[in-house]
Amino acid sequence: MLVGGNSQARDLANTLLEGDYLANRNFAYSEKLGACDTTDLASLPEAALFRSADLILITIHVPGPDCTGAKLEQLRRLTKADIIFVGPKNFGWNMNPLGRVAMADRGKTLVDALPFITQRNDLMARKLPRGTYLDLMRLLGPDGRRLPAFDAGGNPLSQDREHFTKYGAVFASKPVADEIERLRR
C-alpha cells in the first residue's frame, strides 16, 4: 500500500496505524504523489512503488477535480492498484473556544468546517469516478459540513483545525479503514 500527499497523507497513515489497518501490509509513503503534482510519475525513483502497490491512497486538501482527474489517469496508466483519493477534514476557524466546552457537552459538540473546504469537498465527491473518493467530512460528521470536535471521552480530535490528534486518529481509524475496504469492493 502506498499513501501519497503532504501532511494530510502522513495524518492518514497515522490514522491507519492507530487502527492496526497497516499491521499486515507493506506500507510506503511518498510526498511526490500529491493530487495536483504534475511530475511524470514513471520517471521518479518511486515508480517501482507505484507499479507494485495494490492500493494507493492520495490525500486532497484543496485541489479541484481537474488536476485530480489527471492524476488518476496518469496512475491508471502506471499501475493496476486500487486508487482512492481521500478528501479533506476541517475543524473550522478557531479551536480556542472549544477549550471552554464542559466535559459533559464535549461528546455532542460539532464544529463547522470552512465553507470553501466543504464546497471543494462536495465538488470532488460529484466529479471523481465512483469508488475513487473517500469523503472524510461525510464519513466522520453528520452532514458533510460539520465534524465532531471531541471523542466520547471529551478528548480533542484536532489541535490545529486540519490534522488529527492521537485521539482523532483513534476516533477515525475504524471508519476510515472500513470505508477504504468498502470502496475497494
Q: What does each model-found stretch correspond to?
A:
Residues 1-185:
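Extracellular glycan-modifying ectodomains
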